[in-house]
Amino acid sequence: MSILRSPFRLIRSPARFFPSLFHSSCNQSFTNGLKHQSTSSKAMPVSAFYIPSFNLFGKGCLAEAAKQIKMSGFKNTLIVTDPGIIKVGLYDKVKALLEEQSITVHLYDGVQPNPTVGNVNQGLEIVKKENCDSMVSIGGGSAHDCAKGIALLATNGGKIADYEGVDKSSKPQLPLIAINTTAGTASEMTRFAIITEETRHIKMAIIDKHTMPILSVNDPETMYGLPPSLTAATGMDALTHAVEAYVSTAANPITDACAVKCIELVNKYLKRAVDNGKDEEARDNMAYAEFLGGMAFNNASLGYVHAMAHQLGGFYGIPHGVCNAVLLAHVQKFNSRDPRANARLGDIAFHLGCEEHTAEAALDRISQLVLEVKIRPHLVDLGVKEKDFDVLVDHAMKDACGATNPIQPTHDEVKAIFKSAM
């Protein structure tokens, strides 16, 4: 395959050639609260960069993905998806492409918008019954996260709750190929999976080097039919990934470069994609934006926007991207008390195209973008109740994503942020 002549692009990761290096220290960098040192004369600390070993981009790359699955030797796969993907015919298209490569296909299509422990267990039953040697997820973060949970249990055993936190597994998961249909979560290329525990109404954050797909596929043609509301929510999710990664205590020059380019692309193209889903330039660039944001937070991790948003999604069932959109400016206003974070928010203002390069300008532009893409900006409009704050705060403070926030807030401070977003 000639990359220069191909209508799609391929990105390979050095991780496939040096796996011991890329599985060694990145997690330690953010669980220990590693501080950004780009402006210091001290030597940079040892870090690593996680990315799937094989990534496909561009119109028409879906067919190439099927060939790559065949070349990897897989013969019996489970497709994990949701009813919406079935309805629009994308499942049938992928199934046909795989069957052309003599790959047997099984289906689990029960994934919910916030995938649950029950979803994971149902999919796992099919994997065991059919003795699948691989999995393919089709969709956005919900399908990919659910598939990661299934794949992890297929090889490691136990319950999915056993893997909440950071690097709790001991074995690589069942090989997973992730076909992405939204420009936001970047779950097709990260080591993060978020699973809802139905009985406790909380979201469990699983951050594990073994959950990364072996192949990610971003074919913009699969995104053209995405409705405006979902385009807006997933796009704001991508922006949140980039902003949180940039102010993270585990940021490094590589994640910084990915984050700021993501911020620029979202600022330029998200509203266009929301206004006209058939705008190919906007869709293509949002696909790149979400992948860049994924590379940033997959290695620098996140912060309290996600730690808090997970609780809103688990408790009320609010779409994840909407939660992030509403909380992003409020959490960053709190973070701006930290001098380093304040300066970095000024950088973000520059990349958002603001005339003034200040934290305040960045927050104003973020709030403006939320309105431009027609997301309701207040939690009260989404059904959030102040009487639930204490429970939400308790769970947010236990969320692994908060470990790299610029400031570790108190219970009362997290509660105040929730209140400010009402």
UniProtKB/Swiss-Prot annotation:
- Catalytic activity, EC: 1.1.1.1
UniProt-annotated binding residues for Fe(2+)? 237, 241, 306, 320
Top-tier EC class: oxidoreductase
Q: Where in the cell is it found?
A: Mitochondrion matrix
The reaction(s) annotated as catalysed by this protein in its Swiss-Prot or TrEMBL entry are: a primary alcohol + NAD(+) = an aldehyde + NADH + H(+); a secondary alcohol + NAD(+) = a ketone + NADH + H(+); ethanol + NAD(+) = acetaldehyde + NADH + H(+)
Cite a single Pfam family from the UniProt record.
Fe-ADH
Keyword Oxidoreductase recorded: yes
Binding positions (NAD(+)): 82, 114, 141-142, 181-182, 190, 192, 203, 225, 310, 320
CDD domains to which the protein is assigned, alphabetical: PDDH (cd08188)
Q: What induces or represses this gene?
A: Induced in response to zinc deficiency.
Q: Which domain of life is it from?
A: Eukaryota
- Assign the protein's first listed, main location to one coarse class: mitochondrion
The record's PROSITE patterns line, in alphabetical order, gives: ADH_IRON_1 (PS00913), ADH_IRON_2 (PS00060)
Question: What positions does the transit peptide occupy in this chain?
Answer: 1-29
Q: Which UniProt keywords apply?
A: Iron, Metal-binding, Mitochondrion, NAD, Oxidoreductase, Transit peptide, Zinc
UniProt keyword annotation of Mitochondrion present: yes
The GO annotation for biological process reads: glycolytic fermentation to ethanol
Q: Which GO terms describe its molecular function?
A: alcohol dehydrogenase (NAD+) activity; ethanol dehydrogenase (NAD+) activity; metal ion binding
Q: Which GO terms describe its cellular component?
A: mitochondrial matrix; mitochondrion
The free-text function statement in the UniProt record for this protein reads:
Involved in ethanol oxidation in mitochondria.
Assigned protein family:
Belongs to the iron-containing alcohol dehydrogenase family.
PANTHER family assigned: ALCOHOL DEHYDROGENASE, ALCOHOL DEHYDROGENASE 4
> What is this protein called in UniProt?
Alcohol dehydrogenase 4
Q: Which organism is it from?
A: Schizosaccharomyces pombe (strain 972 / ATCC 24843)
